[in-house]
A protein has these predicted regions:
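Cytosolic regulatory regions of ion transport systems
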Residues: 1-621
Length: 621
C-alpha cells in the first residue's frame, strides 16, 4: 500500500473543509479576499510607490485595495501610472470574482435554510394538541371533525407527522377541509416509525395520538411498527387511537401498543355497518350523525335526581336530549330492560346536539294515549339478498349477514372476481349461490332477476384503484335505478364507496344507503381522540349482539296522519321495550345531508308521521 503524500493529505483536508457548508465556503472566500488585498497592496507599493497622490502609508493603500475588491466600479475614477492602473484593474477583477462568489454562496445558503424550513423539521412546541401519525384520505375527515370539536376552545392545534412534503400536506388540507377556524394545523415531514422524528411532535404534551393505516400493501405492519415506536418512548404516554385493516392483527397490535392504545378494526366496523344498513335503510346516515360533531353527539351524565328511578322513566326525563342506555361498572348496555333501576354509580348515556342541551325537563311530558298503537312484531321470514361485486371484506360481510337472517335465507353472489364465493364454509342460516357476472352490464344484471330480492348490496371491487372502482359502482347503481323505474321493482340498495366526493353523484341513483368506509373510520377515530370514554358505546352500537338501531314503520307505534308529540312516540316505543331516538320523513329520504332523518327532536315537538315514515329505535332483533 502506497504512502499518503502531503499533497493528498492537503487535498483531503481541503475537501472536508469545503463540504462543511456555506459558512466554511464563506470562510475560504474571506481568506482569498485577504490574500488578494495583501497582494494588491504589495504590488502597489512595489510597482507604483507614492500612488495614488496623497497616500502616505501602508494602511491607506490597504484600504484602497479593499475598496477596489469590494466595489470594482471604483476603477473608473482612478488616475495614475500604467503600473498603478494595471494593479488596481487586476484587483478589481479579483474583487468582482469574489463578490460574485459571495452573492452566490449567500443565495445558496439561504435556499438551503428555506428548504430545511420547508421540510418541517423543527420541534412542535404546542401542548394539549392532537397528534396524527401517518397519512391517508382519512386525515381530511379527522382534521375537519377535530376543528369542529375544538371550535369552542380559544387555542387548539393538530400536529401531523408523515412521509410527505410539508407544504403539500398543508395545501391539501387547506383545499379539502377549508376553514380551520381557531385551530392551528402543524405539519412535519418525517417517519412516524422513527423515535427521532416522533420527538418532533412533543408527544409528552399531547392530549391524544391518532395512528392512521396507510394505503398500499400490508398497512397493519406499518401501524404496529408505529405503536412499537410509541411504546418505546420515555416519558408521558398520551392515549393512542389506531386503525387496523384486518382483525387478524388486533392481538399483535395490542401487544405492541400496550394498555393506552384503543384499536379500531376498519374492515370489521365497515362490514358491520354495511350489513346493518342493508337491512335497516338509513342506518348509515344515523351512524354518521352520531359520529360527526355536526349533529347529535353522545354524552355521559350522572344526574343525582334520576337515581332510584327506572330506565323507562328516564326516557322522559330530558327535554332536548334522548337517553339511550346506561354505563354501569359492569359495562355499557344500550336500551336495557325498561324496569332497570338506575344506581348511584351508573351513568346515563344520552344523545344531544350540545352539552348545554343535556338538561332535565321541568315537568312531565304530555302523552296522547289515544294515538299510541300496540302492533305486534312481524315474524322474521327467510329473505333473499343479492351481493354484487367482491372484495377482501366480502367474506366477513356474509358471515355477519348469516347471523342476522332466519334459516332458509338465500344470498346470491354475482361477480366476475376470481375469489368470489370462496372461504364460506360454516354458514348456519344462509344458502349461498355464486354466479359469474359483469355488474356494470345491463343485460347481465337483468338476467339475475333482481326484482326477486329484498335487499341488494353493491361492494367496491378491490381489483381496481379507488377512483375506478367508484366509477364502476356508480354505473351499477345507475343500472339498478333504471331497472327499478322501468320494471317497477322494489328492493333496498346499500352501496360501498371510497371517495366522499362521489356521494353527491351517487344521490342521483337514489340508493338507500351509501357507506363511505374511509369516512366512517375517520369519524370514529376523531370521536375516540376527543372522547376516549365513548369507545365502549360505539363498540356496542356496531356489535350484532344486544340492541341495535332500527328504522321501523311508524304505523307500528302511533296513528299515522295524526299530530302527536315526540314524547308520545317515545312512550309507544317504551311499551314495546324499545328506545326511540328519532324518525325518518320518507318524503325527504333523498335530500342531503340528513336524508329525512331527524335525530333527538324536542320531546314537545309535534310531528305527523305517514304510512311510509319510520321511527328510529334502539331495539333487540
Amino acid at each position: 500500500m502506497s504512502k499518503v503524500t502531503f499533497r493528498e493529505r492537503a487535498r483531503y483536508w481541503f475537501d472536508n473543509t469545503m463540504s462543511k457548508g456555506t459558512a466554511s465556503l464563506i470562510g475560504w472566500l474571506a481568506v482569498v479576499s485577504v490574500g488578494l488585498i495583501v497582494l494588491v497592496t504589495v504590488l502597489t507599493l512595489w510597482l507604483a510607490p507614492g500612488e495614488p497622490e496623497g497616500v502616505s502609508n501602508v494602511g491607506e493603500v490597504l484600504w484602497i485595495a479593499l475598496m477596489h475588491a469590494l466595489n470594482p466600479g471604483r476603477i473608473a475614477g482612478d488616475k495614475g501610472s500604467i503600473a498603478y492602473m494595471t494593479v488596481m484593474f487586476a484587483g478589481s477583477l479579483g474583487g468582482l470574482f469574489i463578490v460574485s462568489m459571495l452573492v452566490g454562496l449567500l443565495a445558496n445558503g439561504l435556499k438551503e435554510k428555506v428548504d430545511r424550513l420547508r421540510r418541517g423539521r423543527s420541534r412542535v412546541v404546542e401542548s394539549g394538541h392532537t397528534v396524527v401519525l401517518g397519512w391517508s384520505d382519512q386525515v381530511f375527515t379527522i382534521v375537519s371533525e377535530l376543528v369542529k370539536a375544538q371550535s369552542s376552545q380559544k387555542r387548539s392545534a393538530i400536529a401531523i407527522l408523515a412521509e410527505r412534503d410539508k407544504l403539500d400536506m398543508e395545501e391539501q388540507i387547506r383545499e379539502t377541509v377549508g376553514d380551520l377556524g381557531k385551530t392551528r394545523v402543524v405539519c412535519r415531514t418525517g417517519r412516524p416509525t422513527e423515535p427521532r422524528d416522533l420527538a418532533l411532535m412533543n408527544l409528552a404534551g399531547a392530549a391524544s395520538v391518532v395512528v392512521l393505516s396507510p394505503e398500499g400493501e400490508d398497512p397493519d405492519a406499518h401501524v404496529i411498527k408505529i405503536l412499537l415506536a410509541l411504546a418505546k418512548r420515555k416519558g408521558a404516554h398520551p392515549p393512542v387511537v389506531a386503525a387496523l385493516a384486518s382483525s387478524r392483527n388486533i392481538a399483535a397490535a395490542r401487544l405492541a401498543g400496550g394498555e393506552e392504545v384503543h384499536l379500531v378494526d376498519s374492515d370489521d366496523t365497515a362490514s358491520r355497518l354495511i350489513v346493518q344498513s342493508s337491512r335497516q335503510s338509513g342506518m348509515s346516515v344515523v351512524c354518521m350523525d352520531l359520529l360527526n360533531f355536526d349533529g347529535g353527539e353522545i354524552y355521559l351524565r350522572t344526574p343525582k335526581k334520576l337515581v332510584g328511578i327506572t330506565y323507562g322513566e328516564a326516557l322522559h326525563a330530558y327535554q332536548t336530549a334522548s337517553a339511550i342506555g346506561l354505563r354501569r361498572p359492569s359495562g355499557v348496555v344500550l336500551n336495557p330492560p325498561m324496569d332497570t333501576v338506575i344506581n348511584a354509580d351508573d351513568q346515563i348515556i344520552v344523545i344531544a346536539y350540545d352539552d348545554s342541551h343535556v338538561r332535565l325537563a321541568a315537568g312531565k311530558h304530555a302523552v296522547d294515549e289515544g294515538a299510541i298503537v300496540m302492533a305486534e312484531s312481524e315474524p322474521l321470514e327467510p329473505e333473499r339478498t343479492l351481493l354484487l361485486n367482491w372484495n377482501g371484506r366480502a367474506e366477513q360481510i356474509i358471515r355477519y349477514l348469516d347471523g342476522y337472517v332466519s334459516p332458509g335465507a338465500v344470498l346470491e353472489v354475482a361477480a366476475d372476481h376470481p375469489k368470489a364465493g370462496t372461504n364460506l364454509a360454516g354458514l348456519r342460516n344462509l344458502t349461498v349461490n355464486v354466479k359469474d357476472c359483469d355488474t356494470t352490464d345491463r343485460f347481465a344484471l337483468e338476467s339475475l332477476g333482481v326484482g326477486l330480492f329484498q335487499h341488494v348490496i353493491v361492494l367496491s371491487d378491490d381489483r381496481f384503484d379507488a377512483r375506478h372502482s367508484d366509477t364502476r359502482t356508480l354505473m351499477t347503481l345507475l343500472q339498478l335505478r333504471d331497472m327499478q323505474s322501468t320494471l317497477g321493482e322494489h328492493y333496498s340498495i346499500v352501496s360501498e364507496m371510497h371517495d366522499e366526493n362521489n356521494r353527491a353523484l351517487a344521490e342521483v341513483t337514489e340508493a338507500d344507503d351509501i357507506v363511505i368506509s374511509d369516512t366512517v373510520i375517520g369519524l370514529l377515530l376523531a370521536q375516540l381522540a376527543e372522547n376516549r370514554h365513548l369507545a365502549d358505546v360505539f363498540a356496542y352500537l356496531f356489535d350484532s349482539r344486544g340492541s341495535e338501531i332500527y328504522p321501523r314503520p311508524a304505523a307500528s307505534y302511533v296513528k299515522t296522519g295524526t299530530k302527536v308529540t315526540f314524547s308520545t312516540v317515545v312512550e309507544a316505543a317504551r311499551r314495546r321495550g324499545e328506545t326511540a331516538i328519532g324518525y325518518r320523513d320518507s318524503q325527504a329520504r333523498n335530500d342531503p345531508p340528513h336524508y329525512g332523518i331527524v335525530l333527538n327532536p324536542d320531546k314537545s315537538e309535534v310531528v305527523v308521521l305517514g304510512e311510509r315514515d319510520s321511527v328510529i329505535v334502539l331495539a333487540e332483533r
